[in-house]
Every structure is written in structure tokens, then in C-alpha cells.
């Protein structure tokens, strides 16, 4: 029975994706949502800021896509948290498909869940899809929410409602992660007496994408040469006086990465369990990400230096600790200089545990 339910869910998500994201139905599709029909019947109300008492029982959430990986699901979660803040209502927690990630991330600690609210008699209402960059769309969603003022409602955004920047909730999720109960049991293979550099190279499914030229997968591809060039440039600078180790998080075997065989102090962490890999990317002094939400999300939680591909579908915050690399040209002299300056600051963080000349 469980397998049948999983299959039905996959079929539903596929049809849902094709209808909303491939066919792009017009404005008429708004009437498919009861929340929009309610808004049309009850008309525009006062600004929600003028009626604070009316929004006390309004919540918003986004369900993590159960068919996606944890990086994608975190993107869904972040979107729900962000849109609740944007529209001035309370956030209702939605669990990840694997409960072990709930306890690992700790995002639900101190939050009331959508499931709890529905059991208390709150009504579920699904919001229409909207373009977050369209003021007209955002205002419409705001007015739909306002039309329910005074009622007990949990609003659900559409499946995979997009939120591009993601870093708008960076401080909140970092605080949640660092204060989660699971942090008390945190175990790391990193050495305290050297600079720890984590590299995530996405392979697995996108290798197949290279073979069949699936555009949804080829756009996620970065060659191993891209990483080798970055690492060689970094090593050249670090060998001037820093003790360091490089940890590679990916899938496969060492033989799958011949371009990296000459990189010194390289530790292969291939096929490490997902949560352990995720944690080590978060805790790295320097994190080199891929075109993958699985390393982008740890970058949002990290306090370290992040080196990221500039061409990515989620945004990056401004700041010297975010070094955005051109895929063709690699690190510039200015970026290498900035990296070295920031690495030097680790001396203040770790005292004399790093070996400096």
C-alpha cells in the first residue's frame, strides 16, 4: 500500500509540474483556487497593517516537496518562512519528508506546525502561484490573505512556489541550526590545528544528464577541471605559510577524479552519509560549492568563506565572504587576495593553532 501511495504521489507531482510549469496557464487558472474565489466574493479589505487583530490566526507555510532532495526541500522550507514574513502573518512549520532531517536541522524547534493547527480546527487554503518579482502578483496574494482577516486559516503556497534569493532568511535559519538540540551530539572529522576546506562536486544523477543531454541536469554540471583550477590556485597561496586540509564530498571513487590527483592534502569523503556531509560543509573554514542546493544550503548556514559558481539560479548575499567565480576564468587575482586576507583572520578565530609564517 505504501508503494502505491508513493507512486500516486509521483504521478500527481508530474502532472502538477507539467500543468503549472510547462503549460503556464493564464489568469483564468486563478479561479481554480478557492482562496482566490473567496477574495473575489468578499472584495478588497483594509491594509493588513491597519487590522493587526485580524491576522492573529493567519498562518502560512510551504510543504517541502517529498520527491526532491534535501537541498530542494530546504529551499521550499525557506520559501514558506520568507513569504510568511513578507505577508506579515505567522509561520506554520511543515516537516521534511525524512523526519531525521527535522531533528538534524532543528528548524521546527519552537514553531507550531501546520498539522497541529489543522487539528485545532484551522482551515487549509492554497494560495495561487505568483511571480515574486511582480509587484502586481505579490499585491494580489497580500489581498487574498487580507480577505480572510479574523478567520483561522493556514495558507499553503503552491508546490515548489519559487523563492530566488533564499538568503533573506539566512540569519534565522543559521540561528535555528546552531541552537538545535542535535548540535550537542555533533561529531566532526576536521582537525582543529589547520584550515579545513570542503569541496562539493555534484555527480550522481547529473552524470546521466551529461550522457542524455537532459537540460534540467546539464545546467547543473561543472567540470572537475573547474574545481582543480580553483584548488590549485588556492593551494599555491596557502603553501606560503598555512596548514590546511581539503575534503572532497561527492559520489563515486577516487579514480573518477583524476584531475585532482596532484592536489596535496586531499581527503576523499566519497559516499559519506548525507547529514554528515552536510554538517561538514557547514563547518568548513572554506566551502567550495557546486551548482547544487545540497551545498548552497550549507553555505547559507556557514560562518566561513564561500566560493561559489557565479551562474546559479539562487541568489547570493553581498559580502567579501561570498566569492563568486566565473566558470571559464576561475578565481581572479583580486579574489585570491581577498581569500588570503580572510584566511588570515582565522588566526584571530583559532589563535596560534594555525601554522603561520
Predicted regions and their residues:
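Histidine-anchored nucleotide/phosphate-binding helix
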Residues: 74-86, 227-235
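Soluble, non-transmembrane catalytic domains of enzymes that act on hydrophobic metabolites at membranes
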Residues: 1-3
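Donor-binding and catalytic core of enzymes assembling or modifying cell-surface/extracellular glycoconjugates
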Residues: 70, 235-310, 315-316, 321-325
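Pan-eukaryotic secretory-pathway lumenal catalytic ectodomains of glycan-active enzymes
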Residues: 312-357
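Short, solvent-exposed loop/turn segments at secondary-structure junctions
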Residues: 67-68, 96-101, 159-162, 202-206, ...
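A short, glycine/small-residue-rich beta-strand->loop->alpha-helix junction that serves as a flexible
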Residues: 65-75
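A structural signal for short, well-ordered beta-strand segments and their strand-loop junctions
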Residues: 60-61, 90-96, 198-200, 247-249, ...
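Secretory-pathway luminal glycosyltransferase catalytic domains
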Residues: 11-20, 27-59, 99-242, 339-357
Amino acid at each position: 500500500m505504501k508503494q502505491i501511495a508513493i507512486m500516486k504521489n509521483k504521478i500527481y507531482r508530474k502532472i502538477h509540474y507539467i500543468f503549472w510549469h510547462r503549460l503556464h496557464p493564464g489568469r483564468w487558472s486563478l479561479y481554480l483556487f478557492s482562496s482566490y474565489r473567496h477574495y473575489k466574493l468578499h472584495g478588497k479589505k483594509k491594509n493588513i497593517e491597519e487590522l493587526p487583530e485580524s491576522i492573529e490566526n493567519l498562518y502560512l507555510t510551504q510543504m517541502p516537496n517529498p520527491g526532491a532532495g534535501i537541498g530542494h526541500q530546504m529551499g521550499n522550507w525557506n520559501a514558506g518562512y520568507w513569504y510568511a514574513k513578507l505577508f506579515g502573518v505567522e509561520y506554520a512549520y511543515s516537516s521534511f519528508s525524512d523526519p531525521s532531517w527535522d531533528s538534524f536541522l532543528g528548524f521546527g524547534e519552537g514553531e507550531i506546525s501546520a498539522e497541529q493547527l489543522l487539528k485545532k480546527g484551522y482551515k487549509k487554503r492554497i494560495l495561487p502561484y505568483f511571480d515574486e518579482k511582480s509587484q502586481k502578483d505579490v499585491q494580489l496574494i497580500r489581498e487574498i490573505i487580507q480577505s480572510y482577516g479574523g478567520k483561522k486559516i493556514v495558507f499553503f503556497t503552491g508546490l515548489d512556489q519559487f523563492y530566488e534569493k533564499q538568503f533573506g532568511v539566512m540569519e534565522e535559519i543559521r540561528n535555528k541550526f546552531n541552537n538545535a538540540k542535535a548540535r550537542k551530539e555533533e561529531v566532526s572529522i576536521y582537525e582543529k590545528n589547520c584550515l579545513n576546506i570542503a569541496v562539493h562536486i555534484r555527480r550522481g544523477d547529473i552524470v546521466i544528464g551529461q550522457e542524455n543531454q537532459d537540460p534540467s541536469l546539464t545546467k547543473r554540471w561543472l567540470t572537475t577541471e573547474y574545481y582543480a583550477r580553483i584548488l590549485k590556485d588556492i593551494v599555491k597561496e596557502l603553501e606560503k605559510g598555512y596548514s590546511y586540509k581539503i575534503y572532497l564530498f561527492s559520489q563515486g571513487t577516487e579514480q573518477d577524479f583524476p584531475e585532482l590527483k596532484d592536489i596535496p592534502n586531499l581527503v576523499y569523503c566519497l559516499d559519506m552519509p548525507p547529514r554528515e556531509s552536510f554538517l561538514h560543509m557547514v563547518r568548513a573554514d572554506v566551502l567550495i560549492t557546486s551548482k547544487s542546493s545540497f551545498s548552497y544550503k550549507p553555505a547559507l548556514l556557514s560562518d566561513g568563506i564561500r566560493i561559489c559558481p557565479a551562474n546559479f539560479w539562487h541568489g547570493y548575499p553581498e559580502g567579501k565572504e561570498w566569492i563568486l567565480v566565473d566558470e571559464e576564468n576561475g578565481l581572479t587575482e583580486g579574489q585570491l587576495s581577498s581569500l588570503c586576507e580572510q584566511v588570515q583572520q582565522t588566526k584571530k578565530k583559532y589563535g596560534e593553532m594555525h601554522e603561520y609564517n
